[in-house]
Amino acid sequence: MSPADRSPSHHRSRLKGYFAGALALSWMGSTGMAADSPGIATLAVHFVGLKSSQGAVMVAVFNSEAAYENSGTASDAATRSLKLEIKDGTASATLDGIPPGEYAIKAFHDLNGDAKLNTNLFGIPTEPVGFSNDAPVHMHVPSWKETVFVVHTGENAISIHLD
């Protein structure tokens, strides 16, 4: 090792190189590289037709029927929970690095910002709700079977209306 290799400026230069390489790798991963890897998927979720930009869209993503059916309106059993900002009547999120498989989504437009699905005395939501596959609400939460969709390796997308 030469004296130049032991200098502080040489070590700083090497550290900058490592940092730049790590930054480039993380940027490539965030732009879809992970979705091209075997067994990895990206899911873009779009909520459309929102009647107000007030509040946020609260999202719970489930990867099993048991978690979905036992969650009620809480997101504690969810694989991923998100709070999305609303812009121009839409809200979107991209879930990177998820395993391919079956998923279902429950969401609601939290109009008053209390992070809870508000209901009337009979338990009927007073805030707009939506489910994957735009499964309709008929006096009960749609079942896993009605809401389940398959995420494949690579890029996937789903749109959900909140009513």
PLM features: residue spans?
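Short, flexible loop/turn segments at beta-strand junctions in immunoglobulin-like
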Residues: 95-97
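A short, amphipathic beta-strand motif
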Residues: 41-49, 59, 160
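Bacterial N-terminal signal peptides
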Residues: 14-30
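Acidic, glycine-anchored loop motifs typical of Ca2+
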Residues: 111-119
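A short tyrosine-centered beta-strand micro-motif
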Residues: 101-107
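Beta-strand signatures of extracellular beta-sandwich domains
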Residues: 58-62, 106
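Bacterial N-terminal signal peptides that target proteins for export
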Residues: 3-19
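Short strand-edge motifs at loop-to-beta-strand transitions and within beta-strands
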Residues: 82, 89-93, 145-147, 156-158
